[in-house]
């Protein structure tokens, strides 16, 4: 009897999993646009640079609680994010030029 109950328990778990999967499929998925994602990435790059600039200004003015290593870390993060943004832009321009050179 215990083997049958064990199998019934497994079957009920599988049925519950299948029902939850169907429920998740029926929910409308939010639309994510390429332009929206690109705009959000540019905003994050801008925010990173703003934070670095603000930290550098605070350190220059001698405000307490702002350490040089934090300023340098923020400046490096801003630099790396800007370089990444430039590389993404270069790849997008190259892809656009390749598409435009295709013959229809």
Curated annotation (Swiss-Prot):
GO biological process, one term: bacterial-type flagellum-dependent cell motility
InterPro entries: FliE (IPR001624)
GO cellular component: bacterial-type flagellum basal body
Disulfide bridge partners, by residue number: none
Keyword match Iron: no
Compartment(s): Bacterial flagellum basal body
GO MF term set: cytoskeletal motor activity; structural molecule activity
Keyword Ribosomal protein tagged: no
Domain of life: Bacteria
Pfam families: FliE (PF02049)
Keywords for the protein's UniProt record, in alphabetical order: Bacterial flagellum
Family membership noted in the UniProt record: Belongs to the FliE family.
HAMAP family documented for this protein: FliE
Record's protein name: Flagellar hook-basal body complex protein FliE
Organism: Shigella flexneri
């Amino acid at each position: 009897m215990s083997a049958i109950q064990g199998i019934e328990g497994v079957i009920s778990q599988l049925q519950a999993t299948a029902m939850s999967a169907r429920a998740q499929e029926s929910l409308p998925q939010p639309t994510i646009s390429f332009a929206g994602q690109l705009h959000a990435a540019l905003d994050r790059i801008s925010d990173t640079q703003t934070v670095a600039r603000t930290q550098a200004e605070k350190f220059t003015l001698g405000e307490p609680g702002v350490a040089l290593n934090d300023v340098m870390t923020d400046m490096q993060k801003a630099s790396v994010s800007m370089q990444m943004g430039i590389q993404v832009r270069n790849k997008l321009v190259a892809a656009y030029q390749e598409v435009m050179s295709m013959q229809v």
